[in-house]
Amino acid sequence: MRAGEVAALSLDDVHWRAGEITVRGKGSRCDRLPLPADVGEAICAYLHDRHPASTQERALFVRVKAPLVALTSCGVSSVVAAAARRAGLGTVGAHRLRHTAATQMLRAGASLPQIGQVLRHRYMSTTAIYAKTDREALREIARPWPGGRA
């Protein structure tokens, strides 16, 4: 998901019984996506332990300090960056997670249309930008040049 999509989530977007979440994306796009069990459990833990009960805010992710309002996309990016630093990953932005997910799916054998569907891209050309491969991966799948070394 994009940082802006995470920031826009409301409590009403989580459909617990159906195991789904409604995501409002770019271009007024609205999709109901599967909610993996581990993600649902993490959201439950967040709501129980961290979500301020004193707020009237319907946003799923709310600032923990006053004013108790919805996180912005910049706030989501800040949370991701702080978690990456704590994990020893250095500087990592929220959008980098989309690039990494696309690359990992590609390496696992997913097709560009499949990756585009997961990332919810309208155009394959957009997915191709995200699905970057490294030179080593290209060497492994490239056919040897005739007369060259294998």
Feature roles, as predicted:
Residues 1-42:
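Conserved tyrosine-mediated DNA breakage-rejoining catalytic core shared by Y-recombinases
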Residues 46, 132-150:
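DNA/chromatin major-groove-contacting recognition/catalytic segments
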Residues 33, 77-117:
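Short, basic (Lys/Arg/His-rich) helix/loop patches that form interaction surfaces
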Residues 19, 32, 56-57, 65, ...:
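A cross-kingdom feature marking solvent-exposed beta-strand/loop segments within repeated
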Residues 14-16, 72, 89-91, 110-129, ...:
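Short, polar N-cap/turn motifs at the start of nucleic acid-interacting alpha helices
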